Amino acid sequence: MPSNQNRDNFIDKAFTVIAESIVKIMPIAEKEKKAYIYYRDGLAAQNNGDYSEALEYYKESLLLEENKIDRGETLKNMAIIYMSNGEEDLSIETYEKALVENPKQPSCLKNIGLIYEKRGRNAEQNGDLDQRDIWFDKAAEVWSKAVRLYPGGYLDIENWLKNSGRSSIDMYL
């Protein structure tokens, strides 16, 4: 196990050195370079489990980043942290912001649906079947969009949609 970990650390370090070299020599504005560095540092902190530090780096990156796709990716990473921290409403709000920046992120839709589906299961456990159906319908709505964007990529969700009777035939056309 340690040899695999050493190899992984070597690969991570090599990638970081290469990425930093590319950023230094690329003819891009200083502002964009700083945005990337904040994003990269946020990703490293997130991977190390330091979520509060990661969020700070991501927020700094967003202040500088102008590219919508990159902004969407940063917001998606922030939403993942909020979701991990149990801040579901903030997570949904942040995923929705990510989708405004880059509407072609099926993983954002998938994760919003996961929150809705969880809320539906909780309502069902509490005996509130009307509320369960509301949450499950919301999950189905966003999951259907995710499946359309990434056909075959979320087979478990496709199965849930079919088994729950919430699948629409046009989803597969």
UniProtKB/Swiss-Prot annotation:
Primary location: membrane
Disulphides: none
GO terms for cellular component: plasma membrane-derived thylakoid membrane
The entry's keywords: Membrane, Photosynthesis, Repeat, Thylakoid, TPR repeat
Localisation per UniProt entry: Cellular thylakoid membrane
Top-level taxon: Bacteria
Pfam families per UniProt: TPR_7, TPR_8
Topological relation to the membrane, as annotated: Peripheral membrane protein
Biological process (GO), any one: photosynthesis
Extent of the TPR repeats: 35-68, 72-105, 120-153
Stored HAMAP family: Ycf3
Family: Belongs to the Ycf3 family.
Role of this protein: Essential for the assembly of the photosystem I (PSI) complex. May act as a chaperone-like factor to guide the assembly of the PSI subunits.
Name this protein carries in UniProt: Photosystem I assembly protein Ycf3
Organism: Prochlorococcus marinus (strain MIT 9301)
